Amino acid sequence: MSDWSGSVPANAENGKSTGLILKQGDTISVVAHGWVKYGRDNVEWAAPDGPVPNNPQPSSIATLVAKIANKKFAIGNGVLHKTVPVDGELILLFNDVPGTFGDNSGEFQVEVIIESRYSPLK
């Protein structure tokens, strides 16, 4: 059972809001799959982990990332048991060059599980 499940469109420059408010110290897992097209050419395809090998891009471009408090974090095909470094809402997005999202299409399917909430001893 996931805390959030949905699609992350490749053409959403501001990403997809999950509505999940995370706190520093929470532990989450994220799993993603699917294919998106991020350009006009027929070789510009990417999975959450990045572009197909015949069209290499800089390491952070054409990948799935999380944004929390305006800081980006690599997600790719998924992360397991990761500690959230900052407080904020979890936004998921396809990382592309700003201003170039208009020719993107497709979406990733993503599931997010909040495994534990940070609760320090008092």
Curated annotation (Swiss-Prot):
Binding-site positions, an alpha-D-galactoside: E44, Q57, D96, D103
Gene3D superfamilies in the cross-refs: Galactose-binding lectin (2.60.120.430)
Biotechnology comment: Can be used as a fluorescent probe for the specific detection and visualization of the alpha-Gal epitope present on porcine tissues. This epitope is mainly responsible for hyperacute rejection of porcine organ transplants in humans during xenotransplantation.
Question: Where along this sequence does the record place binding of Ca(2+)?
Answer: Y38, D96, T100, D103, N104
User: What keywords is this UniProt entry annotated with?
Assistant: Calcium, Lectin, Metal-binding
A single MF term (Gene Ontology) = metal ion binding
Q: Pfam families, per this entry?
A: PA-IL
Residue pairs linked by disulfide bridges in the UniProt entry:
none
Entry's family note: Belongs to the LecA/PllA lectin family.
Q: What does this protein do?
A: Lectin that specifically binds alpha-galactoside-terminating glycoconjugates. Shows high apparent binding to the alpha-Gal epitope (Gal-alpha-1,3-Gal-beta-1,4-GlcNAc terminating glycans) as well as to Gal-alpha-1,4-GlcNAc and Gal-alpha-1,3-GalNAc. Gal-alpha-1,3-GalNAc may be one natural ligand bound by PllA both in the nematode symbiont and in infected insects.
The UniProt subunit note reads as follows: Homotetramer.
Q: What is this protein called?
A: Lectin A
